[in-house]
Amino acid sequence: GVIPCGESCVFIPCISSVVGCSCKNKVCYRN
């Protein structure tokens, strides 16, 4: 939840969720 994955999740889910990223405040974060 602290490291930005460089991906937004406004319209689509985080593709980077496969590496542990999750959506928070319309941006994908890791940890």
Swiss-Prot record:
Record's comment on post-translational modification: This is a cyclic peptide.
Family stated for the protein in its record: Belongs to the cyclotide family. Bracelet subfamily.
Protein's job:
Probably participates in a plant defense mechanism.
Matching InterPro entries, A to Z?
Cyclotide, Cyclotide_bracelet_CS, Cyclotide_sf
According to UniProt, the tissues expressing it are described as:
Expressed in pedicel, root and stem but not in leaf and fruit (at protein level).
Q: What is this protein called?
A: Chassatide C5
Q: Does the keyword Disulfide bond apply?
A: yes
Q: List the disulfide bonds.
A: 5-21, 9-23, 14-28
Do the record's keywords include Disulfide bond? Answer: yes
Task: Please state what the annotation says regarding this protein's domains.
Answer: The presence of a 'disulfide through disulfide knot' structurally defines this protein as a knottin.
Q: Which Pfam families match?
A: Cyclotide
Report keywords, A-Z: Disulfide bond, Knottin, Plant defense
List the GO biological process terms: defense response
Q: Where is this cross-link: Cyclopeptide (Gly-Asn)?
A: 1-31
